[in-house]
UniProtKB/Swiss-Prot annotation:
Keywords of the record: FAD, Flavoprotein, Glycoprotein, Oxidoreductase, Signal
Alphabetical list of PROSITE patterns matching this protein: FAD_PCMH
Pathway annotation from the record: Sesquiterpene biosynthesis
EC code(s) of this entry: 1.-.-.-
Family: Belongs to the oxygen-dependent FAD-linked oxidoreductase family.
FAD-binding PCMH-type domain: residues covered: 63-235
Pfam families reported in the protein's UniProt record: FAD_binding_4
Gene: prx3
Purpose of the protein: FAD-dependent monooxygenase; part of the gene cluster that mediates the biosynthesis of PR-toxin, a bicyclic sesquiterpene belonging to the eremophilane class and acting as a mycotoxin. The first step of the pathway is catalyzed by the aristolochene synthase which performs the cyclization of trans,trans-farnesyl diphosphate (FPP) to the bicyclic sesquiterpene aristolochene. Following the formation of aristolochene, the non-oxygenated aristolochene is converted to the trioxygenated intermediate eremofortin B, via 7-epi-neopetasone.
Taxonomic lineage: Eukaryota, Fungi, Dikarya, Ascomycota, Pezizomycotina
Signal peptide: 1-22
Disulfide bonds: none
Induction line: Expression and the subsequent production of PR-toxin take place under static culture conditions (oxygen limited), whereas no expression of the PR-toxin genes occurs under the strongly aerated conditions required for optimal penicillin production. There is a negative control of the transcription of the PR-toxin genes by the penicillin biosynthesis gene product(s), or by a regulatory peptide encoded by a small ORF inside the penicillin gene cluster.
Organism: Penicillium rubens (strain ATCC 28089 / DSM 1075 / NRRL 1951 / Wisconsin 54-1255) (Penicillium chrysogenum)
Protein name: FAD-dependent monooxygenase prx3
Transport is among the record's keywords: no
């Protein structure tokens, strides 16, 4: 039995803890009110049509949440001011640019503040030379290409116009121009960043160079980037388009990619790009193929892609003379921006080789056959997409100054990243589908290890929810994480971006 003194001490401790909790809840309840008072034109409350547009219709229905309010700052200074209010209130929040990350919590939040950067939408050249374009963090790539196409210029930006600028670049960034320019992030010459203490700073090769390095793939762990300054380059002509294939063309498509994805193949041409997908509709059993092709220049029949263009297709729209804007408009999947589906990405990697290409395809169909339970799901489609990080891309990333991702070339053919993706209709199927994709990744990794082709890397922008914790352990062959943590501690000693923004990819969640 407790003594009277012990009882009184326990009672006091309980009431004190209750008081602390009540104080925190009170501060958080007032955060939206304070945002509204300070920034009435930038704060959106539940019930408004704008709130519904920003919140109720995410790209993936797996990310459907209800924040307490939405804060849409119109400048870096408003970001800093809003962040100060959230920090003082100890208020959890999420930051969304365009929200094409189908990981719950990465760009959405319940019972917290959702900061959206869509009002940071300027696109302008840094000076009359037009060698650098300054891009507000709230833009989609389509917005950027509309400006650049007028001058026959391009940047190492996203392949799909509906994708947001910020998320793609903070995760590295795959583009049509990777072989010449490395990751999209390797073309960033300056970041405008709001730090946890409210400072608006520049991060580039001369100023805050450690932060500059860390932001090239280190995700949302250091501050809120409000502007990206990217180097431009001339692309007056492009050949390319997209093609759709029926089941009879799938073996030739995989064979063509097996020839392409080696150093002696078409991928040795830095002007070429190809990333074919195999699609399987679980409901109908239909198998089909889709691919985007691009070749920089005005060659109407690029030799690097001949193995693909010789394959009979059900539809293709290849032509020459396109700007980056025209090419993107023609190849953007029709339903890419539709937000009425549940989406999942999952990713792994292999040392590129013809054997690796065949192994990925065989594993895809073997795991489908071994999991008949997926046929009970509602309207599920699954895809296998090949994405090659060529030797040229790896060299370009290194010569640009490097990045935390730190790819190396194990066999001289580059790194083959695999994206196994899915979309479906009903939340009741989530658990079944998540397990199915985890089984597929595990099976491919095991098979790759047995034949010496496993490459320990997950492309952050294509990761599954189950892959968020050890992403950074895989960077730079396991050596980047301590440095990233040190930089984060330097710029955010109170761990605002580790604890108040709980979703997504966090160093605090990564094993040592």
């Amino acid at each position: 039995m407790l003594s009277l003194g012990a009882f009184l001490a326990l009672s006091l401790s309980f009431h004190l803890s209750q008081g602390v909790v009540a104080s925190v809840l009170h501060r958080r309840a007032n955060a939206c009110k304070k945002l509204s008072r300070s920034y009435p034109n930038s704060t959106i409350h539940p019930g408004s049509s704008v709130f519904a547009e920003d919140v109720i219709e995410p790209w993936s229905q797996t990310c459907q949440t209800t924040p307490t309010c939405v804060f849409a700052p119109a400048s870096a200074e408003e970001v800093a001011g809003g962040l100060a209010i959230l920090r003082k209130a100890d208020q959890t929040f999420a930051v969304r640019t365009q929200g094409h990350m189908p990981i719950p919590g990465a760009a959405d939040i319940s019972n917290g503040v959702l900061m959206v950067t869509t009002s940071l939408n300027s696109v302008q050249y840094a000076d009359d030379s037009k060698s650098v374009v300054q891009i507000g963090a709230g833009n989609r790539w389509l917005d950027v290409y509309k400006v650049l196409a007028k001058d026959s210029l391009a940047v190492a930006g996203g392949r799909f116009g509906q994708v947001g600028v910020s998320g793609l670049l903070l995760g590295g960034g795959i583009s049509y121009f990777n072989s010449d320019h490395g990751w999209g992030a390797n073309s960033v010459v300056n970041y405008e960043v709001v730090l946890a203490n409210g400072t608006v700073c520049a991060a580039n090769a001369q100023q805050n160079s450690d932060l500059y390095w860390a932001l090239k793939g280190g995700a949302f762990n250091f501050g809120i980037v409000t502007r990206f300054d990217l180097a431009t380059f001339s692309v007056p002509y492009m050949w390319g388009g997209s093609a759709y294939y029926d089941a009879s063309a799938l073996d030739p498509l995989v064979n063509a990619y097996a020839s392409y994805a080696v150093a002696s193949g078409g991928s040795s041409d830095p002007a070429a790009h190809s990333d074919p997908s195999i699609l399987y509709n679980v409901t109908t059993g239909e198998v089909s193929g889709y691919s985007i092709y691009m070749h920089r220049g005005d060659d109407p029949a690029p030799a690097a892609l001949k193995n693909f263009t010789d394959i009979p297709s059900t539809f293709q729209d290849f032509r020459v003379g396109k700007t980056i804007l025209g090419h993107e408009n023609d190849t953007n999947p029709v339903n890419f921006g539709v937000g009425n589906r549940r989406q999942l990405f999952s990713s792994t990697a292999l040392a590129s080789s013809a054997e690796a290409v065949y192994l990925v395809n065989q594993t895809f169909f073997d795991v489908i056959a071994a999991n008949p339970q997926i046929k009970t799901t509602t309207d599920l489609s699954v895809t296998n997409t090949y994405q090659l990080f060529t030797p040229g891309m790896i060299r370009a990333a290194e010569t640009s100054g490097g990045d935390p991702i730190g790819l190396y070339d194990p066999l001289g053919n580059g790194v083959l990243a695999v994206l196994y993706g899915g979309n479906w209709a009903d939340a009741k199927d989530d658990e079944t589908i998540y397990k199915f994709f985890q089984d597929m990744i595990d099976e491919l990794d095991n098979r790759a290890k047995k034949v010496g082709l496993y490459y320990d890397f997950v492309y952050l922008n294509d990761a599954a929810p189950t892959q968020t914790k050890d992403i950074f352990q895989k960077f730079s062959n396991g050596t980047a994480l301590p440095k990233l943590r040190e930089i984060a501690e330097s710029y955010d000693p109170d761990q605002v971006f580790q604890t108040l923004t709980p979703g997504g990819f966090k160093f605090i969640n990564s094993p040592a």
